[in-house]
Amino acid sequence: FASALEEARADLFGLYYIADPKLVELGILSDKDAYKAQYSNYIRNGLMVQTNRIELGRQITEAHMQNRQLIAMWCYEHGQKHNVIGKKVKNGKTYFVVNDFEALRGLFGELLAEIQRIKSEGDYEAGKNLIMRYAVDIDPELHKEVLDRYAALGLKPYGGFVNPEIVPVEKDGQIVDYKVEYPDDFLGQMLHYCHKYSVL
C-alpha cells in the first residue's frame, strides 16, 4: 500500500498547490482559472479514462492508477453532500463534472492531510483501508462503458513522450551555455536510457 499512498501524497500536493494564486503572481500560470482544466482532467481520468487499460473484471493493481482512482473516488464520495463532483448520463454516456472547484481543492487538502498523517504515524490499517475501499475495485458497468467508448476511438491505451536533453556547451573547458536536444524517436530515447542508466 505504501507505493500507492506515496503517489497519492505527491499528486495531492501538486493538485492542491496548482490552484494557489501565487502561481499566477509568479507568472507560472497564465490565468487564475487555469488549474480548473487539470482538476477536471484528473477527476475524469481517475474515475473513468484510465480503466481502459484494464481487462473487464480485473482490479486496479498498479500504484499510479490506484492513486488516481483513490483521489478521484474519495473526493467524489466526500463531496456528494454538496455536489462537488456530479455524475451525469447523457445519451447513454457517463460524464463526471466538477461543479465546485474551490470545494474540490479543499477535499484535496483534506485527503493530503490524512495521507500525510498515515505516512508520518505509520498507520498501516488506515492506509490499507483507504486503498482497499477507494483504489482497487472498478464499477463493472462503468468499466464496460469506458472500454466500449475507447474501442470506438481506435486509440492505444498508453501514450509515450520524448524528453528533451539539456546539453552543456563548452568553450576552452568552461561551460558557457546549454542547448536543448531531442532524441530522433521514442525507441531511441528508451534505448539511450537503458544504455546510460541501467546500472542505477
Regions found by a protein language model. Name each.
Residues 3-20:
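An active-site-proximal "capping" alpha-helix that borders the catalytic cofactor pocket
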Residues 1-3, 119:
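Active-site-flanking segments in enzyme catalytic domains
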Residues 15-118:
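Long, well-structured alpha-helical subdomains associated
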